[in-house]
């Protein structure tokens, strides 16, 4: 009886939208957040049908991440839907393109050219069984294997030129009266989604949610806000014709994590982060030379890139720095005590200027 080798079925590659690639963790569709360091702790990018929550403190650093998120979407021909905010003026404040190319693209290109081919591959080949010699060598996908054009670098000192072909929409404000204050917001979103072509990537941006500047007092009540979050979460996860992702910021100084609104928001969210700024002291030419605060991870949609567990505590203490060109997240280390060292140096170099104690009784 003869046996025939069973060949693997050939599967046609799926056509991904622009700015979307497969995750190396579970092959989900992910897209860039606009910040390469933020993408690293998101295991390459934001998964589709995700709701990200950023809890901001007294400083408005969370708006930088939201602007990077929206600017990246416009550069990738994605559709932007802006929640209750200052309106179309918000799009004029988006960061523009940076003159410096992205580090990821440079590193990928350098890695491809810096490793020359081996002169004698027969000497370096591992001696294994003959039946395994023809097996193709596969490389595990890493975060460095980023396709060109997946992410862009932006400059906060410049403004993005919003072209006529860029599609975006602005939501109206919630009502101050009525049984459902968020009815015009949901109607605006569903009407906008119905006009999009199937397969479009739509990014939802909700800056300073629950802020009294954009939301009425009635809209901040738990019974209305929880209903709105449930409706928004179901739209993000159940809409099949359009790929939705949402990023919102919440002022933690007005609504703590213990209140009912934030409790349900974190439970329904795919990822939760919080920013805790430091008091800024040292600056050089108007630029901050130290981390601006702590960046804490409370919840993640995927496991961390350096572990196989979806445990946010594995990241350790992180800090963030906002410069002219990027929002950087890196491990936080306590700085040296420069003030005490300067005082000791001054006292050693200038002994005459030290105050002389009186010895008279």
From Swiss-Prot:
Which Gene3D superfamilies did the record assign? P-loop containing nucleotide triphosphate hydrolases
Keywords of the record = Cytoplasm, Nucleus, tRNA processing
Q: In which pathway does it act?
A: tRNA modification; 5-methoxycarbonylmethyl-2-thiouridine-tRNA biosynthesis
Which stretches are tagged as biased composition: Polar residues?
Answer: 104-121, 346-355
Cellular compartment(s): Cytoplasm; Nucleus
Q: What does the entry give for GO biological process?
A: regulation of cytoplasmic translational fidelity; tRNA wobble base 5-methoxycarbonylmethyl-2-thiouridinylation; tRNA wobble uridine modification
Q: Which InterPro entries match?
A: Elongator_complex_protein_4, P-loop_NTPase
CDD domains noted in UniProt: Elp4
Keyword Cytoplasm attached: yes
- Where do the record's region annotations for Disordered lie? 93-124, 338-361
Which purpose does this protein serve, as stated in its record?
Component of the elongator complex, a multiprotein complex which is required for multiple tRNA modifications, including mcm5U (5-methoxycarbonylmethyl uridine), mcm5s2U (5-methoxycarbonylmethyl-2-thiouridine), and ncm5U (5-carbamoylmethyl uridine). The elongator complex catalyzes formation of carboxymethyluridine in the wobble base at position 34 in tRNAs.
Q: Which family does it belong to?
A: Belongs to the ELP4 family.
Description of how the protein assembles with itself and partners: Component of the elongator complex.
Output this protein's name. Elongator complex protein 4
- Native organism taxonomy: Eukaryota, Fungi, Dikarya, Ascomycota, Taphrinomycotina
Name the gene for this chain: elp4
